[in-house]
Amino acid sequence: LAKTIVNPGGDDQDRGQNAFFYDAAEGLLTSVILLLAEYVPPDSSGHEKRHIVSVFKLVQELLAPSGQGKKTGFQVLMDNLPSTHKARWFAGAALNTSEQGMASVMSTVLSRLNAFLDSELEQVLCFDSAIDAEHFAAEKSAIFLVLPEEDSTKNFMAGLMIQNLSRELFSVADEHGGKLQNRVVFYCDELGTMPPFDILPLFSAGRSRKLTLVPIIQSLAQLEKNYGKEGAEIISDNCQDTIFGGFAPNSQTAETLSKALGSRTVLTGSVSRGKDSNSQSLQMVERALLSPDELKSLPKGNFIVMKTGTHPMRTKLQLYFKWGISFEEPYQVPERAQREVYYAGKEELLMNIKKSLYSQPQPVTASKPDGYMSSYAEK
């Protein structure tokens, strides 16, 4: 989760000289998430405080001076942990840098978490979810993720959802011999308008685990804009099936796909007539299977299907309701009133850490028999 938040694109090469700050921010965020999960259980009323907004609140509070010399609240918190605690290890890079570097690392974490500060998102993120990867893969089910078109600030949730769910599904597949019990398909409509995320492993690692990704875009240029030329080529090369149609008159994608369709050999000829004689010539020439102009003029409802191992096919694809598929009643999203959100704080976390450590039984050292040292000294 921390890696997805700090580096959603998954490309470490773009960090340059700031690689240390991003790596340290990833470790610090992992550390805070571990502490929140371990030491902040639900309160006596059952209110859950372990959510991503509490992580932001904790990092903001721990950035402030502690009043103990020049140490920040985060450094004081780490001092209260055992030297072998994993949270302390993850935060090692941030703890062993300068004061200014420490502030830069924590500011990087806060900037990455700013996107989660939304009252509407809180109602989704700060409460338990019914989505469970293991049950989702084992049962016949579907998840619909609907994002508001008028508010693009929430688009990052699509990539975050796909990345985390796919990683959990990878773990489920590994527990069942390397494959999921049922095939899982991600239909990513308008993928080209979404912020870039680490999508490439889904194509390489997902196929062998019965996990399929269906990216739906309007133009190949959208992929190149978000993932670069090399990333766009990798995504295109990993698509075993390609369906396209309905091109705009000025579409450049039609030219690319026309070349991908290949060519055929046709017979052409010419006739020349003169005053005294006529001549005729025939020759075989190469011609595109479908030219860009022909692709752009495809009637509505007509599509080209390209599949690995077969020749391209032109077909008509109808909407689902024309196949006789209907629903008994429209699905209504249940309305939920504004629920109160509870947050974890620095003082609560520190108190729970001390309470947990002090309540653990101290190791008992073996006592030496009476007179041991004296008898040894006499010898």
Where are these regions (language model features)?
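Conserved ATP-driven motor cores of ASCE-family P-loop NTPases powering translocation/secretion/packaging/pilus
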Residues: F203-I304
